[in-house]
């Protein structure tokens, strides 16, 4: 993966912590499971061994993914984010034009930090892609699987 990914310092540290746990804890636990399953004898019909090897494969893939993301990461400083347009790490306040009483707020983040429950949406999501580069007052139509959403951007800001 040579695509640059943009993370907050917290997001970068979370990925680093996950990598540390996988490398120093989980990997060792799985190797112990494999050794234990091997001790049971015939590996050709050993479901325990097969399951442990599958788990090892998944862990090694995740380790590789995390290492790749961390090496391609650019840590963004929220203090340096402009608010003239919607960028990654900006928050936006939107008015639903189909229901003007509904005001929603999103913060645009990388896919790695997206958390819809916390109002953090990926810049690669349909909503994120529709908002990037827009300014206050812009009316946006967002195509989602259920149809179209119509919003007006009321405010662009950076959360502390």
UniProtKB/Swiss-Prot annotation:
GO biological processes: DNA-templated transcription elongation; regulation of DNA-templated transcription elongation
GO molecular function list: DNA binding; RNA polymerase binding
Pfam families from the UniProt entry: GreA_GreB, GreA_GreB_N
Keyword line: Coiled coil, DNA-binding, Transcription, Transcription regulation
Listed InterPro entries: GreA/GreB_C_sf, TF_GreA/GreB_CS, Tscrpt_elong_fac_GreA, Tscrpt_elong_fac_GreA/B, Tscrpt_elong_fac_GreA/B_C, Tscrpt_elong_fac_GreA/B_fam, Tscrpt_elong_fac_GreA/B_N, Tscrpt_elong_fac_GreA/B_N_sf
Domain of life of the native organism: Bacteria
Coiled coil: 45-74
Entries under PANTHER family matching the protein: TRANSCRIPTION ELONGATION FACTOR GREA
Family: Belongs to the GreA/GreB family.
Stated role: Necessary for efficient RNA polymerase transcription elongation past template-encoded arresting sites. The arresting sites in DNA have the property of trapping a certain fraction of elongating RNA polymerases that pass through, resulting in locked ternary complexes. Cleavage of the nascent transcript by cleavage factors such as GreA or GreB allows the resumption of elongation from the new 3'terminus. GreA releases sequences of 2 to 3 nucleotides.
Name of this chain's protein: Transcription elongation factor GreA
